[in-house]
């Protein structure tokens, strides 16, 4: 289950997107997305440049939502979501390469301004996967 061990949280956890987390998202090729389903974690992914083309700000990340039916069902039951991204192009604390987990609350929006923005950039999208960032944990 997501966040089932809060005592294990990284001491370097920060609120919203700090400069390192933002740089990581700006350079990540692929982002893994985890939601909690009734039978355990559900893992999907998206291309990092898709979020960059729609929108990343200090509090929110937006991906185009194609299918994501199970992701949407999971988020309706439990809005917690985690993103994992990594890039060797970002300097880590111990050498080349940085990775991190972004924790937040998510929803799939099929209507509204954010869905329209996603559909304008990606005509195949049925809406937007919107992540409200709560905190980031850098790894590596």
How would you describe each model-predicted region?
Residues 1-140:
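Binding-site signature for planar aromatic cofactors or substrates
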């Amino acid at each position: 289950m997501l966040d089932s061990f809060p005592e294990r949280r990284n001491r370097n956890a920060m609120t919203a997107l700090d400069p390192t987390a933002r740089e990581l998202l700006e350079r990540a090729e692929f982002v893994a997305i985890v939601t909690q389903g009734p039978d355990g974690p559900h893992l999907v992914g998206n291309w990092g440049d898709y979020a960059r083309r729609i929108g990343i700000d200090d509090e929110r990340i937006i991906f185009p939502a194609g299918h994501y039916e199970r992701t949407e069902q999971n988020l309706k039951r439990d809005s917690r979501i985690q993103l994992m991204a990594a890039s060797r192009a970002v300097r880590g604390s111990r050498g080349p390469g940085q990775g991190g987990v972004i924790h937040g609350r998510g929803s799939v929006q099929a209507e509204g301004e954010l869905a329209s923005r996603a559909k304008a950039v990606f005509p195949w999208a049925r809406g937007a996967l919107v992540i409200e960032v709560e905190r980031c944990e850098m790894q590596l």
